Amino acid sequence: MKIFCYGTLQESNVQLDLVGRVVDGPITYVSGYVVLRDYVDPEDGIAYPRVVPAENGCVYGRVLDFTDAEVKVLDAYETEMYVLEDIQVASGETVKIYMPS
């Protein structure tokens, strides 16, 4: 499954920890969104990124291809805070993205 990653899932150390391999993919962007880091988890104190609509916004990231088994691991990592939705990247391709739930 191709997923547009705009946060920690782009980091090789996170990928290695989660799926046991480094996943690389093309840099691209989605228009009409911005990344906010305005939610701080009260348990760990970390500010997590989230993508929200913004008329003139643009979010850069990478399209990474994960297996179905890897996506299950990513879903657990992202918790109920995020859900997979369809989004169109700059090339016109429709891929998945973790959006705030």
What are these regions (language model features)?
Residues M1-S101:
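Glycine-aromatic micro-motifs
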